[in-house]
From Swiss-Prot:
Enzyme class (EC, first level): transferase
Protein name: tRNA (guanine-N(1)-)-methyltransferase
UniProt superkingdom: Bacteria
PANTHER family: TRNA (GUANINE-N(1)-)-METHYLTRANSFERASE
Localization per Swiss-Prot or TrEMBL: Cytoplasm
Protein's job: Specifically methylates guanosine-37 in various tRNAs.
Biased composition (Acidic residues): 255-264
Region described as Disordered: 240-264
Organism listed in the record: Sorangium cellulosum (strain So ce56)
Pfam families linked to this entry: tRNA_m1G_MT
Residues noted as binding S-adenosyl-L-methionine in the record, renumbered to the chain: 133, 152-157
InterPro entries for the chain: Alpha/beta_knot_MTases, tRNA_m1G_MeTrfase_C_sf, tRNA_m1G_MeTrfase_TrmD, tRNA_m1G_MTases_N, tRNA_MeTrfase_TRMD/TRM10
Gene name as annotated: trmD
Protein backbone atom coordinates (compact mmCIF):
# COMPACT_ATOMS: atom_id res chain seq x y z
CA UNK A 1 0.00 0.00 0.00
CA UNK A 2 1.14 3.53 -0.76
CA UNK A 3 0.05 6.52 1.32
CA UNK A 4 0.74 10.10 0.22
CA UNK A 5 0.43 12.91 2.76
CA UNK A 6 -0.05 16.55 1.81
CA UNK A 7 1.14 18.56 4.80
CA UNK A 8 2.84 21.85 5.62
CA UNK A 9 4.87 20.00 8.25
CA UNK A 10 6.40 16.80 6.82
CA UNK A 11 8.85 16.70 9.73
CA UNK A 12 5.98 15.84 12.10
CA UNK A 13 5.82 12.39 10.49
CA UNK A 14 9.49 11.46 10.84
CA UNK A 15 9.28 9.90 14.29
CA UNK A 16 5.87 8.38 13.67
CA UNK A 17 7.06 6.60 10.52
CA UNK A 18 10.25 5.32 12.13
CA UNK A 19 8.90 3.26 15.02
CA UNK A 20 6.39 0.58 15.95
CA UNK A 21 4.16 -1.26 13.56
CA UNK A 22 4.24 1.53 10.97
CA UNK A 23 8.04 1.47 10.94
CA UNK A 24 8.06 -2.31 10.54
CA UNK A 25 5.55 -2.11 7.69
CA UNK A 26 7.80 0.38 5.90
CA UNK A 27 10.87 -1.76 6.48
CA UNK A 28 9.14 -4.88 5.16
CA UNK A 29 7.86 -3.15 2.03
CA UNK A 30 4.19 -3.65 2.93
CA UNK A 31 3.83 0.13 3.14
CA UNK A 32 5.32 3.11 1.33
CA UNK A 33 4.73 6.68 2.51
CA UNK A 34 5.49 9.97 0.78
CA UNK A 35 5.02 13.36 2.40
CA UNK A 36 4.96 16.55 0.35
CA UNK A 37 4.38 20.15 1.31
CA UNK A 38 2.07 22.45 -0.66
CA UNK A 39 4.58 25.18 0.17
CA UNK A 40 6.65 23.81 -2.71
CA UNK A 41 3.91 25.28 -4.88
CA UNK A 42 3.40 28.44 -2.83
CA UNK A 43 3.39 31.95 -4.23
CA UNK A 44 5.95 34.70 -3.95
CA UNK A 45 9.22 34.94 -2.11
CA UNK A 46 7.73 33.41 1.04
CA UNK A 47 6.00 30.53 -0.75
CA UNK A 48 2.64 31.60 0.64
CA UNK A 49 -0.05 28.90 0.67
CA UNK A 50 -2.83 30.85 2.40
CA UNK A 51 -4.75 34.10 1.93
CA UNK A 52 -7.47 36.20 3.52
CA UNK A 53 -11.05 34.95 3.06
CA UNK A 54 -13.36 36.59 0.54
CA UNK A 55 -16.21 38.36 2.32
CA UNK A 56 -14.06 39.03 5.37
CA UNK A 57 -13.61 37.06 8.54
CA UNK A 58 -10.88 35.96 10.91
CA UNK A 59 -7.92 33.79 10.06
CA UNK A 60 -6.37 32.67 6.81
CA UNK A 61 -7.62 30.10 4.30
CA UNK A 62 -5.47 27.55 2.48
CA UNK A 63 -5.35 28.22 -1.25
CA UNK A 64 -6.93 25.72 -3.62
CA UNK A 65 -4.21 26.09 -6.27
CA UNK A 66 -1.37 25.14 -3.92
CA UNK A 67 -3.20 22.08 -2.58
CA UNK A 68 -4.26 20.80 -6.00
CA UNK A 69 -0.83 21.31 -7.54
CA UNK A 70 0.69 19.33 -4.69
CA UNK A 71 -1.77 16.48 -5.27
CA UNK A 72 -1.09 16.55 -8.99
CA UNK A 73 2.65 16.44 -8.39
CA UNK A 74 2.19 13.34 -6.26
CA UNK A 75 0.11 11.76 -9.03
CA UNK A 76 2.78 12.60 -11.60
CA UNK A 77 5.48 11.10 -9.41
CA UNK A 78 3.38 7.97 -8.97
CA UNK A 79 2.85 7.70 -12.72
CA UNK A 80 6.61 7.81 -13.19
CA UNK A 81 7.11 5.09 -10.60
CA UNK A 82 9.06 7.36 -8.26
CA UNK A 83 10.10 5.64 -5.04
CA UNK A 84 8.40 6.73 -1.84
CA UNK A 85 10.14 8.07 1.24
CA UNK A 86 11.06 5.75 4.10
CA UNK A 87 13.03 5.87 7.36
CA UNK A 88 16.84 5.81 6.97
CA UNK A 89 18.15 2.36 6.07
CA UNK A 90 14.72 0.95 5.18
CA UNK A 91 14.24 -0.45 1.70
CA UNK A 92 10.49 0.18 1.64
CA UNK A 93 10.33 2.22 -1.52
CA UNK A 94 11.12 -0.13 -4.35
CA UNK A 95 8.78 0.44 -7.25
CA UNK A 96 8.38 -1.41 -10.53
CA UNK A 97 6.53 0.61 -13.13
CA UNK A 98 3.81 3.24 -12.71
CA UNK A 99 1.96 3.47 -9.43
CA UNK A 100 -1.83 3.97 -9.29
CA UNK A 101 -3.45 7.36 -8.70
CA UNK A 102 -4.16 7.75 -5.01
CA UNK A 103 -7.67 7.88 -3.58
CA UNK A 104 -7.80 11.42 -2.18
CA UNK A 105 -9.05 12.00 1.36
CA UNK A 106 -9.58 15.44 2.89
CA UNK A 107 -9.12 15.44 6.68
CA UNK A 108 -11.64 17.88 8.11
CA UNK A 109 -14.06 18.11 11.09
CA UNK A 110 -16.83 18.41 8.48
CA UNK A 111 -16.13 14.92 7.10
CA UNK A 112 -17.77 11.58 7.77
CA UNK A 113 -16.71 9.99 11.08
CA UNK A 114 -13.74 7.67 10.69
CA UNK A 115 -14.76 4.14 11.68
CA UNK A 116 -13.24 0.69 11.46
CA UNK A 117 -15.25 -0.06 8.32
CA UNK A 118 -13.59 2.89 6.60
CA UNK A 119 -10.14 1.76 7.77
CA UNK A 120 -10.80 -1.66 6.23
CA UNK A 121 -11.95 -0.02 3.00
CA UNK A 122 -8.93 2.28 2.74
CA UNK A 123 -6.47 -0.48 3.64
CA UNK A 124 -7.75 -2.46 0.65
CA UNK A 125 -6.81 0.36 -1.74
CA UNK A 126 -3.38 0.34 -3.40
CA UNK A 127 -2.87 4.07 -2.83
CA UNK A 128 -4.42 6.77 -0.62
CA UNK A 129 -3.60 10.50 -0.40
CA UNK A 130 -4.34 12.26 2.90
CA UNK A 131 -4.70 16.05 2.75
CA UNK A 132 -3.94 17.87 6.02
CA UNK A 133 -5.33 21.34 6.62
CA UNK A 134 -4.10 24.26 8.72
CA UNK A 135 -5.20 27.80 9.57
CA UNK A 136 -8.97 28.41 9.12
CA UNK A 137 -9.31 25.47 6.76
CA UNK A 138 -9.45 24.94 3.01
CA UNK A 139 -10.78 27.01 0.17
CA UNK A 140 -14.14 25.35 -0.54
CA UNK A 141 -13.03 24.49 -4.08
CA UNK A 142 -10.51 21.96 -2.74
CA UNK A 143 -13.45 19.64 -2.22
CA UNK A 144 -13.94 19.37 -5.98
CA UNK A 145 -10.54 17.69 -6.27
CA UNK A 146 -10.82 15.01 -3.56
CA UNK A 147 -12.78 11.77 -3.38
CA UNK A 148 -14.08 11.95 0.18
CA UNK A 149 -13.80 13.73 3.53
CA UNK A 150 -13.02 12.11 6.86
CA UNK A 151 -13.25 13.38 10.44
CA UNK A 152 -11.81 11.87 13.62
CA UNK A 153 -14.72 13.22 15.64
CA UNK A 154 -16.70 16.24 16.72
CA UNK A 155 -13.76 18.38 17.77
CA UNK A 156 -11.27 20.72 16.10
CA UNK A 157 -7.46 20.48 16.10
CA UNK A 158 -4.80 22.88 14.86
CA UNK A 159 -4.15 20.76 11.79
CA UNK A 160 -4.85 17.47 10.07
CA UNK A 161 -1.51 15.81 10.75
CA UNK A 162 -2.59 13.93 13.89
CA UNK A 163 -5.70 12.77 12.05
CA UNK A 164 -3.54 11.56 9.17
CA UNK A 165 -1.38 9.56 11.58
CA UNK A 166 -4.49 7.99 13.10
CA UNK A 167 -5.77 6.96 9.67
CA UNK A 168 -2.36 5.56 8.68
CA UNK A 169 -2.05 3.59 11.92
CA UNK A 170 -5.57 2.14 11.65
CA UNK A 171 -4.98 1.07 8.04
CA UNK A 172 -1.44 -0.28 8.38
CA UNK A 173 -2.32 -2.83 11.04
CA UNK A 174 -4.86 -4.32 8.62
CA UNK A 175 -2.32 -4.94 5.85
CA UNK A 176 -1.46 -8.62 5.27
CA UNK A 177 1.57 -9.72 7.25
CA UNK A 178 1.91 -6.53 9.31
CA UNK A 179 0.13 -7.62 12.49
CA UNK A 180 2.05 -10.40 14.21
CA UNK A 181 -1.13 -12.36 14.93
CA UNK A 182 -3.81 -11.69 12.32
CA UNK A 183 -6.44 -13.23 14.61
CA UNK A 184 -5.94 -10.31 17.00
CA UNK A 185 -7.50 -7.90 14.50
CA UNK A 186 -10.43 -10.25 13.95
CA UNK A 187 -11.56 -10.28 17.58
CA UNK A 188 -11.14 -6.70 18.77
CA UNK A 189 -13.54 -3.80 19.22
CA UNK A 190 -15.49 -2.87 16.08
CA UNK A 191 -14.23 -5.93 14.17
CA UNK A 192 -16.58 -7.90 11.86
CA UNK A 193 -16.05 -11.04 13.96
CA UNK A 194 -17.64 -9.27 16.94
CA UNK A 195 -20.42 -7.90 14.75
CA UNK A 196 -19.62 -4.32 15.68
CA UNK A 197 -19.49 -4.93 19.44
CA UNK A 198 -16.75 -3.74 21.78
CA UNK A 199 -14.10 -6.27 22.73
CA UNK A 200 -14.52 -8.44 25.82
CA UNK A 201 -12.26 -7.84 28.89
CA UNK A 202 -8.72 -9.22 28.74
CA UNK A 203 -6.62 -10.49 31.67
CA UNK A 204 -3.10 -11.78 32.28
CA UNK A 205 -0.95 -12.59 35.34
CA UNK A 206 -1.12 -12.15 38.29
CA UNK A 207 -4.35 -14.02 39.05
CA UNK A 208 -5.16 -11.56 41.84
CA UNK A 209 -4.03 -7.98 42.36
CA UNK A 210 -5.19 -5.92 45.33
CA UNK A 211 -8.49 -7.71 45.56
CA UNK A 212 -9.17 -7.82 41.82
CA UNK A 213 -9.25 -11.40 40.48
CA UNK A 214 -9.20 -12.94 37.04
CA UNK A 215 -12.65 -14.52 36.43
CA UNK A 216 -12.67 -18.23 37.25
CA UNK A 217 -14.07 -19.21 33.84
CA UNK A 218 -10.90 -17.96 32.14
CA UNK A 219 -8.71 -20.19 34.32
CA UNK A 220 -10.59 -23.46 33.85
CA UNK A 221 -9.63 -24.28 30.25
CA UNK A 222 -13.19 -24.87 29.03
CA UNK A 223 -12.99 -23.20 25.62
CA UNK A 224 -16.72 -23.34 24.96
CA UNK A 225 -17.46 -21.71 28.30
CA UNK A 226 -14.79 -19.09 27.67
CA UNK A 227 -16.28 -18.28 24.27
CA UNK A 228 -19.74 -17.87 25.82
CA UNK A 229 -18.35 -15.66 28.59
CA UNK A 230 -16.48 -13.47 26.15
CA UNK A 231 -19.52 -13.04 23.95
CA UNK A 232 -21.71 -12.13 26.92
CA UNK A 233 -19.13 -9.67 28.23
CA UNK A 234 -18.75 -8.05 24.80
CA UNK A 235 -22.50 -7.57 24.60
CA UNK A 236 -22.71 -6.19 28.14
CA UNK A 237 -19.80 -3.80 27.66
CA UNK A 238 -21.26 -2.51 24.40
CA UNK A 239 -24.72 -2.08 25.89
CA UNK A 240 -23.33 -0.18 28.88
CA UNK A 241 -20.71 1.97 27.19
CA UNK A 242 -21.87 2.36 23.60
CA UNK A 243 -25.63 1.87 23.29
CA UNK A 244 -25.38 3.47 19.84
CA UNK A 245 -23.24 0.54 18.67
CA UNK A 246 -25.66 -1.90 20.29
CA UNK A 247 -28.58 -0.40 18.39
CA UNK A 248 -26.61 -0.56 15.15
CA UNK A 249 -25.58 -4.19 15.70
CA UNK A 250 -28.83 -5.47 17.20
CA UNK A 251 -31.47 -3.16 15.78
CA UNK A 252 -33.01 -2.37 19.15
CA UNK A 253 -32.40 -0.94 22.60
CA UNK A 254 -30.08 -2.71 25.08
CA UNK A 255 -31.92 -4.88 27.64
CA UNK A 256 -32.53 -2.94 30.86
CA UNK A 257 -34.31 -3.46 34.18
CA UNK A 258 -37.03 -1.21 35.61
CA UNK A 259 -34.44 1.29 36.85
CA UNK A 260 -32.96 1.63 33.40
CA UNK A 261 -29.75 -0.24 34.26
CA UNK A 262 -28.45 -2.54 31.54
CA UNK A 263 -29.00 -6.18 32.48
CA UNK A 264 -26.46 -8.98 32.18
Amino acid sequence: MRIDVVTLFPELFEGFLAIGMVGRALASGALAVRTRSPREFGLGRHRSVDDTPYGGGSGMVMRVDCIVRCLEALDEAAAEGVASSAPPGADATASSGPLPRAHRVLLTPQGQPFRQEKAIELAARPAVALVCGRYEGFDERVRAFVDEEISLGDFVMTGGEVAAMAVIDACVRLLPGVLGNAVSAEHESHSPALAGLLEYPQYTRPVEFRGHKVPDVLQQGNHAAIARWRRAEAELRTAQRRPDLWRKARGGEPPADESGEVRR
